[in-house]
Amino acid sequence: MVSSKDIIQRRALRVRRRIKMVSHDRPRLSVYRSNQNIYAQIIDDSRGCTLVSASTLEGDLKKSLKSGSDKQAAFAVGKLIAERAKKAGVNEVVFDRGAYVYHGRVKALAEAAREGGLNF
């Protein structure tokens, strides 16, 4: 019997496999969503390192947000990751939503990153 955890892992691997096919050596913007916070990082898979990261746990961002688990928080993290990526010289990324549906907080983060100047 297949558990729901196995189904989620398969979905995430399926998404990542598609990303590897179309990435063309671009770094990926990976999103992790917990019940309390949202995290984003830009990863260079060819070198195996994280270039830039942002989350709702960071001090200045945490103080300005009412909650770390709503769309406004995701939007703020998206803006912050785009700003840091531009400083690091990253303009084009591949969006890695993992096993999450492109809706709600994940969509808000992606739209904010696009508004901030990231292309994907």
Swiss-Prot record:
InterPro entries xrefs: Ribosomal_uL18_bac-type (IPR004389), Ribosomal_uL18_bac/euk (IPR005484)
Keyword Ribosomal protein: yes
GO process annotations (BP): translation
Top-level lineage group: Bacteria
Keywords assigned: Ribonucleoprotein, Ribosomal protein, RNA-binding, rRNA-binding
Gene Ontology MF: a single term: 5S rRNA binding
Cellular component per GO, a single term: cytosolic large ribosomal subunit
Pfam families: Ribosomal_L18p
Function text: This is one of the proteins that bind and probably mediate the attachment of the 5S RNA into the large ribosomal subunit, where it forms part of the central protuberance.
Subunit architecture: Part of the 50S ribosomal subunit; part of the 5S rRNA/L5/L18/L25 subcomplex. Contacts the 5S and 23S rRNAs.
NCBIfam families: L18_bact (TIGR00060)
Similarity comment: family membership: Belongs to the universal ribosomal protein uL18 family.
Name of the protein in its database record: Large ribosomal subunit protein uL18
Gene from which the chain derives: rplR
